[in-house]
């Protein structure tokens, strides 16, 4: 098992990575939550049949009372209505401020459960048990929790750090191949922005079997990079913006597909390639880098370009949290392994994307 400690002002928590951790969830939670009597587990309709009873048995074996709440799988559950249902279910279960909420699922479950934990009873302890690769390397680490509004994704949320993150690579075995590779888009992103050697390591292992054989190392490397960024910039005002490489344009592709045609990972993959090509045009990115990135992503079965209208680009740029007034910070690559924010007028960005 590998352990990373995220140290933030006034508090810290561990990210634990290891095969078989799901069956040891009870003892791991008891170690960090000695005074809790109840764990309120939030999961979804895909994950519950696979892993809920295993986690429940482990938690009960450690002396916790367990209440489980299952939401429909999919982005549609990350909404205010589901959040309100969750609050009421927590109150029905008798949740107290000494108890805890555990998210057992992917990014939707983690965001929804985390926002509920941040707001119920003015905040209760929260544990992440991510079951998708995307959630393991991205949304479960860093404390961002949110729900979507009709105006866009993640517009109502909070920063609420977990007490513990448990990552069991075994859960990735049950992911459909497209969902597994969707997570690999975020994995590749870490190599692009911070570690060229890690990018080369991934590019040399394009098959799922090769990647799973190295999964503890992959998860550890990604989480170590994200930890270093989050420790420097918990509230997403500076260094943490680098994690959004590929996301500004990726959100445009998600919007163009009405959030159903393209997965988040596929959109980010295409967004990274578009950002690399943009960087070349702006004189920031080396000319050979886009092809190198496209080859690695194509080998993983991910798209390197997605059709998008000027209107969708404009809508995504308008909602981007890195924008201020008439300008926006776009994350570009100076070289493989080094990302930088590039401030430019929104109008210029939209013109470059035509």
Tell me the role of every PLM-derived stretch.
Residues 16, 115-207:
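A glycine/threonine-rich phosphate-anchoring loop and its flanking beta-alpha core
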Residues 67-69, 102, 127-129, 164-167, ...:
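Hydrophobic/aromatic beta-strand patches that form the interior of the parallel beta-sheet core
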Residues 200-311:
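Active-site segments that bind and position negatively charged phosphate/pyrophosphate groups
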Residues 1-100:
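ATP/NTP phosphate-donor binding region
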Residues 87-104, 113-128:
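Non-catalytic interfacial helical region
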Residues 2-4, 12, 185-187, 284-354:
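C-terminal charged capping/lid subdomain of soluble metabolic enzymes
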Residues 108-115, 136-137, 252:
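Short glycine/serine/threonine-rich phosphate/pyrophosphate-binding segments
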């Amino acid at each position: 098992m590998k352990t990373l400690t995220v140290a933030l002002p006034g508090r810290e928590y561990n990210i634990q990575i290891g095969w078989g951790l799901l069956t040891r969830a009870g003892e791991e939670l008891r170690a960090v939550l000695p005074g809790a009597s109840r764990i309120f587990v939030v999961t979804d309709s895909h994950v519950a049949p696979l892993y809920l009873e295993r986690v429940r048995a482990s938690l009960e074996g450690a002396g916790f009372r367990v209440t489980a709440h299952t939401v429909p799988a999919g982005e549609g559950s990350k909404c205010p209505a589901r959040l309100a249902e969750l609050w009421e279910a927590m109150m029905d279960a008798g949740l107290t401020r000494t108890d805890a909420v555990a998210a057992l699922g992917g990014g939707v479950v983690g965001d929804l459960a985390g926002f509920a934990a941040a707001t119920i009873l003015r905040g209760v302890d929260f544990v992440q048990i991510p079951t998708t690769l995307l959630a393991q390397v991205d949304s479960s680490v860093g404390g961002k929790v949110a729900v979507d509004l009709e105006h866009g994704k993640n517009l109502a949320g909070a920063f609420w750090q977990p007490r513990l993150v448990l990552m069991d690579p075994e859960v990735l075995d049950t992911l459909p191949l497209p969902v597994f590779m969707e997570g690999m888009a975020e994995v590749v992103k870490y190599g692009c922005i911070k570690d060229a050697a890690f990018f080369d390591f991934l590019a040399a292992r394009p098959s799922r079997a090769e990647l799973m054989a190295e999964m503890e190392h992959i998860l550890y490397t990604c989480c170590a990079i994200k930890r270093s960024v989050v420790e420097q910039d918990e509230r997403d005002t500076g260094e943490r913006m680098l994690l959004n490489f590929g996301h500004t344009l990726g959100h445009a592709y998600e919007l163009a597909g009405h959030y159903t045609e393209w997965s988040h990972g596929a959109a980010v993959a295409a967004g990274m390639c578009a950002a690399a090509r943009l960087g070349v045009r702006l004189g920031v990115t080396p000319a050979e880098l886009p092809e190198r990135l496209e080859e690695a992503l194509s080998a993983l079965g991910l798209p390197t370009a997605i059709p998008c209208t000027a209107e969708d680009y404009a809508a995504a740029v308008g909602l981007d949290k890195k924008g201020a007034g008439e300008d926006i910070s776009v994350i570009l690559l100076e070289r493989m392994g080094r990302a930088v924010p590039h401030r430019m007028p929104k109008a210029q960005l939209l013109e470059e994307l035509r």
